[in-house]
């Protein structure tokens, strides 16, 4: 699929700074005809076709209706080359990250399946479909100020300076190849825990007054420590943590009617090397719940203006070569069933769910979610830099640290 998206009448200059950050990352490898951070979501479904219609026919009409309801899904792909023949009843959504985030993807699919689950083929007539209002950018939805306020600008500069220093300098996994090795194919390695194991993790976290995400985060930190030297470990482990900002937005932007937009921020917590498992997880749980502030929301215009400027600035000609970052970003989708219900009347149910993104750098992303009471950990990476053996070993160590830290026995399915 072509990686460049052309929206008639909407040049790059009409994207907000926040949206341009995601757009810039998406297009970073366009010279190789590859897209970075392209979202893919795969759902296996079981369905009884209404009125004898085929699944593909009904799906096509349901998608047309969804596009009318969510105008942000409309696009003209440039360089569309691949076709995916239907082998089984799986629904695959490919979409750009600057257009939607992980939870928004779940919300869109939930609405698509809701349409599909109806007893009659859904109407696509414009006069019978009520489109949602266009969704503004994150900055606008949050009510951020564009005023040249010295305090807001100072807050924004401090936030971005700290973010870049902590995110860029963080150590990560050892990768194969060197700084000139081009990316290849996106891959993933998943661990699907049993229902009993998932419940054991949740019970242990509840007992220790920590979140499941914080426990996974701590296990990930200890896994990365296991690949570093003793000296490298002393700085602790800092990773970029994706944060869902939808609960912080005012109505109506915190609703499913505004699913087709990216509402995500990033924080950079540090896990100290010498702290205990539960101690680290409690500290992370507290940071997850306390980092947000009204000043952050009010400063968003300036935060992403400075962020975009730093990302776009050329490196000084005399600067020493920078080691490509190879950190592991953590992103928790939480309980997917809250946004993708899984059951849609007697005609349709979603049996399996998987989410991921295309990765073109040496960085990797660990996604965590529960669906139908099972916890899944999915490591997304590029196979030019990591073998499947390496990915499997990383995930095995994460699971092992979860077992030891929470004192539970875990089984995968």
From Swiss-Prot:
Gene3D superfamilies: Nonribosomal peptide synthetase, condensation domain. It comes from the Eukaryota. Induction: Expression is positively regulated by the azaterrilone A cluster-specific transcription factor tazR. Part of the gene cluster that mediates the biosynthesis of azaterrilone A and other azaphilones, a class of fungal metabolites characterized by a highly oxygenated pyrano-quinone bicyclic core and exhibiting a broad range of bioactivities. The first step of the pathway begins with the non-reducing polyketide synthase tazA that assembles one acetyl-CoA starter unit, five malonyl-CoA units, and catalyzes a series of Claisen condensations, methylation, PT-mediated cyclization, and finally releases the first hexaketide precursor through the R-domain. Transmembrane segments: none annotated. Pathway: Secondary metabolite biosynthesis. Keywords: Transcription, Transcription regulation. This is Azaphilone biosynthesis cluster protein M. Residues 123-145 are annotated as: Disordered. The keyword Membrane does not apply. Residues 123-138 have a biased composition (Polar residues).
């Amino acid at each position: 699929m072509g990686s460049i998206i052309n929206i008639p009448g909407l040049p790059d200059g009409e994207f907000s700074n926040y949206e341009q950050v995601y757009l810039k990352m998406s297009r970073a490898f366009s010279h190789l005809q590859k897209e970075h951070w392209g979202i893919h979501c795969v759902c296996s479904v079981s369905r009884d076709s209404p009125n004898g219609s085929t699944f593909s026919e009904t799906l096509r009409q349901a998608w047309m209706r969804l596009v009318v309801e969510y105008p942000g899904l409309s696009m003209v792909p440039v360089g569309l080359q691949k076709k995916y023949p239907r082998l089984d009843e799986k629904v695959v959504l490919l979409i750009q990250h600057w257009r939607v985030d992980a939870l928004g993807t779940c919300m869109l699919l939930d609405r698509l399946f809701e349409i599909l689950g109806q007893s009659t083929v859904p109407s696509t007539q414009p006069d019978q479909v009520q489109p949602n209002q266009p969704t503004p950018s994150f900055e606008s939805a949050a009510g951020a100020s564009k005023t040249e306020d010295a305090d807001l600008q100072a807050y924004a500069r401090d936030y971005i300076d700290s973010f870049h220093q902590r995110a860029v300098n963080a150590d990560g996994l050892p990768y194969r190849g060197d700084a000139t090795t081009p990316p290849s194919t996106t891959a993933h390695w998943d661990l699907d825990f049993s229902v009993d194991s998932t419940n054991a993790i949740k019970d242990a976290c509840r007992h220790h007054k920590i979140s499941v995400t914080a426990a996974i985060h701590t296990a990930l930190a200890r896994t990365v420590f296991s690949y570093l030297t003793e000296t490298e470990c002393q700085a602790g482990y800092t990773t970029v943590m994706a944060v869902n900002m939808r609960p912080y937005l005012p109505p109506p932007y915190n609703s499913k009617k505004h699913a087709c937009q990216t509402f995500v921020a990033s924080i950079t917590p540090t896990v100290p090397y010498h702290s205990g498992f539960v101690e680290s997880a409690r500290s992370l749980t507290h940071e997850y719940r306390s980092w947000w502030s009204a000043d952050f929301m009010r400063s968003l215009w300036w935060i992403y203006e400075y962020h975009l400027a730093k990302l776009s600035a050329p490196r000084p000609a005399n600067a020493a070569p920078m080691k490509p970052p190879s950190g592991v970003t953590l992103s928790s989708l939480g309980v997917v069933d809250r946004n993708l219900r899984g059951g849609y009347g007697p005609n349709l149910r979603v049996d399996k769910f998987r989410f991921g993104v295309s990765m073109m750098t040496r960085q990797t992303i660990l996604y965590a979610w529960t669906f139908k009471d099972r916890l899944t950990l999915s490591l997304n990476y590029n196979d030019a830099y990591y073998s499947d053996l390496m990915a499997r070993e990383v995930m095995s160590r994460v699971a092992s640290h979860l077992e030891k830290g929470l004192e539970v026995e875990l089984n995968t399915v």
